[in-house]
Amino acid sequence: MSRIQEAFKGKKAFIPFVTCGDPDLETTKQIVYEMEKAGAALIELGIPFSDPTAEGPVIQGANLRALTGGVTTDKIFDMVKEIRQNTQIPLVFMTYANVVFSYGTERFLEKAKNVGMDGLILPDVPFEEKEEFNIVCKKYGIDLISLIAPTSHDRIRMIAKEASGFVYCVSSLGVTGTRSAITTDIGAMVKLVKEENDIPCAVGFGISTPEQAAKMCQSADGAIVGSAIVKLCEKYGKDCVPYVAEYVKSMVEACK
């Protein structure tokens, strides 16, 4: 059983996201350790990109701050290597096709494997174009995580059939960010996925409160939160670690 599958075993998974290098990589490292202590099941690490099309203003701002601070993909790989000396929590990169391309797809995935990454999410790569990445991901034992949006049933089934690791169910069309209400029928999406593939489904985009997380976890296997955490990093800078830990703890409780 892979580390990702293990993360969903017998429990609902809370999956936090953090932008690497906002405010700096040392703080990101401490955030990862504290998130695990607070009960996170799996952690998404955002590799900053200058044009993050799927992101709302909060995560766009974090990308900009990290890049301005001199964060590079190589420095992030070094950070993950250090993290792996202290924890075996599943780690998944979230970034954009361009970041992987410009590094060299093969080189990127070989390095990801060597430092101990478990998965990769590329929100700007549609299902029809994922194969060139998927072949290399499979070669290195990295799960390429599929995103499923509230679109047609046939499309959801088609994507679910080939999904690996877990399925990222997008709660609403549009960019990431916090929303006051999520109206998508997550239960129906999850049901369609499970009919095709016995794979965990986690819901993201727009979740920020424990109430929302609890509601999502009634029908899904986990909840993913990014913007609400990145807001704390922005607000408190290098002092954000205890605030993030506290927030993650409350969300983990809500997901139970």
Walk through the language-model features, giving the residues of each.
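Glycine-rich phosphate-binding active-site loops on the catalytic face of alpha/beta enzymes
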Residues: 40-51, 117-121, 126-129, 171-177, ...
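N-terminal amphipathic alpha-helix/helix-capping segment at the start of soluble metabolic enzymes
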Residues: 1-18, 79-84
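Alpha/beta catalytic cores of nucleotide-metabolism and tRNA/nucleoside-modifying enzymes
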Residues: 76, 191-199, 208-214, 218-256
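Glycine/Thr-rich beta-alpha phosphate-binding loop at enzyme active sites
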Residues: 61, 69, 156-192, 232-234
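Active-site beta->alpha loop and helix N-cap motifs at the rims of alpha/beta catalytic domains
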Residues: 47, 60-122, 255
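Catalytic cores of alpha/beta
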Residues: 25-35, 151-161, 203, 207-223
